[in-house]
Amino acid sequence: MKTISAKPETVKRDWYIIDADGKTLGRMAAEIAHRLRGKHKPEFTPHVDTGDYIVVINAEKVRVTGRKATDKMYYSHTGFIGGIKSISFEKLIDKAPERTIQNAVKGMLPRGPLGRAMFKKLKVYGGSEHPHTAQQPQELNI
């Protein structure tokens, strides 16, 4: 019996929707990364993108434990000398709530072209509205 290796053209991708209201950021991001990668499928192949599409709604209502709301910092650099910028979780959730989930999931995916392709299948929205009703996403409870 031979081991089955998935081919990119034979992969069947489903759409799932996750409501982030009251969910812990890290635990939810770990499950999202697991599903984007396709590790929950029996035909998982490390060098092929076998993951599903994930739509996350209510990103502004995600929570963190402890004092991370005030202490957790996100850093970016402008490219100019002395151009390092930092923003706390509290301020980032007010400014761009989808970026908190995107940053958490992106850090859990592989680096390189395959990881970037997996990340493109993640759709995050701050509110409860999303434009993916035509894909009929199934609700996923985490």
Swiss-Prot record:
GO cellular component, one term: cytosolic large ribosomal subunit
Keyword Ribonucleoprotein: yes
SUPFAM superfamilies: Ribosomal protein L13
Pfam families in alphabetical order: Ribosomal_L13
One GO BP annotation of this record: negative regulation of translation
Molecular function GO terms recorded: mRNA binding; structural constituent of ribosome
Keyword terms of this UniProt record: Ribonucleoprotein, Ribosomal protein
Keyword Ribonucleoprotein carried by entry: yes
Superkingdom of this protein's organism: Bacteria
Known role: This protein is one of the early assembly proteins of the 50S ribosomal subunit, although it is not seen to bind rRNA by itself. It is important during the early stages of 50S assembly.
Family statement drawn from the similarity comment of this UniProt entry: Belongs to the universal ribosomal protein uL13 family.
NCBIfam families documented for this protein: rplM_bact
Protein name: Large ribosomal subunit protein uL13
